[in-house]
Amino acid sequence: MLSSCVRPVPTTVRFVDSLICNSSRSFMDLKALLSSLNDFASLSFAESWDNVGLLVEPSPPHTVNTLFLTNDLTEEVMEEVLQKKADLILSYHPPIFRPMKRITWNTWKERLVIRALENRVGIYSPHTAYDAAPQGVNNWLAKGLGACTSRPIHPSKAPNYPTEGNHRVEFNVNYTQDLDKVMSAVKGIDGVSVTSFSARTGNEEQTRINLNCTQKALMQVVDFLSRNKQLYQKTEILSLEKPLLLHTGMGRLCTLDESVSLATMIDRIKRHLKLSHIRLALGVGRTLESQVKVVALCAGSGSSVLQGVEADLYLTGEMSHHDTLDAASQGINVILCEHSNTERGFLSDLRDMLDSHLENKINIILSETDRDPLQVV
């Protein structure tokens, strides 16, 4: 009897171990998940006016088993979040944008925050960081046009300077004894990186010194150089720029491999966005048979991004009445699909990309209730 009781134990242990292993693959620490999300698309790509990143954080430690994707976080969507027991909401649009002076039950956005915290649900928003990203919303929107090459309309700047500091100081030193003194002084300033090389000015051998400086270090460098009139008069100070990124930025200017009629392009866009109707403003002198070769697009609200861009067609979610008139007067066709209709379909692609990026460590689900508030009736 004792022997028969002992035998099942290893099987039970293996079963429990299996559950533990599976469980460990189904959770991520919130901080680790946020780091991975930033690796996927850096929040540094977001516009300066935007409110992105972690907006609501439950008290730590907080682990995430289910990540819930939605374009807009409404109260109806929050009900779905709670029913599906999600731990973190990725809301493309930030539900908190303007500063809140109080958290009460009076407004719907305040209620979202209360319900999230009461139920230990975090809220994260990438918004314009995903607009700019190479694998982001605008690239997804461009997929509906057909074969084309595209580039950002307004390229993003790299998040960091290629070298230490944001200023470069350049000057020549004539004599060996001066060189040793100068090199010793500038190398002793924090936030300065130094390079030097031989240079000839006329018939005179000199040493060219380049200093890459932080803003704080620049003031100390200038203070040192200004004590030597001869050095200071030969000094050049350059303000460095962060380089532009080739595939990252706002909007996309797309050149089709082959021109198509406007009517054909309309059909393609409807299929891609799964819409039965769109709004069209024909450019002056254009018809449905006019050819389209270049498309400028911007998911969401495209007025500021598309303004002044030369193209056969503007594609966006919404544009002001007067901006539409301006574009049409220049012979540019305008297609408007409602704001979130040009964004929401990206979430299906995002789910697949995040599954791969996060190595299937957590469950990722799409909202079934999220939808554009405007309907054609």
From Swiss-Prot:
Post-translational modification N6-acetyllysine, affected residues: K109
Keywords tagged on the record: Acetylation, Cytoplasm, Nucleus, Phosphoprotein
Annotated positions of the Phosphoserine modification: S259
Top-rank lineage group of the source organism: Eukaryota
Spans annotated as Mediates interaction with COPS2: 244-377
GO CC term, one of those recorded: nucleus
Modified positions (Phosphothreonine) in chain numbering: T255
Subunit structure: Homodimer. Interacts with COPS2. Interacts with THOC7.
Protein name according to UniProt: NIF3-like protein 1
GO biological process, one term: neuron differentiation
Subcellular location: Cytoplasm; Nucleus
Gene: NIF3L1
Main location: cytoplasm
Known role: May function as a transcriptional corepressor through its interaction with COPS2, negatively regulating the expression of genes involved in neuronal differentiation.
Family in the record: Belongs to the GTP cyclohydrolase I type 2/NIF3 family.
A molecular-function term among this protein's GO annotations: RNA polymerase II-specific DNA-binding transcription factor binding
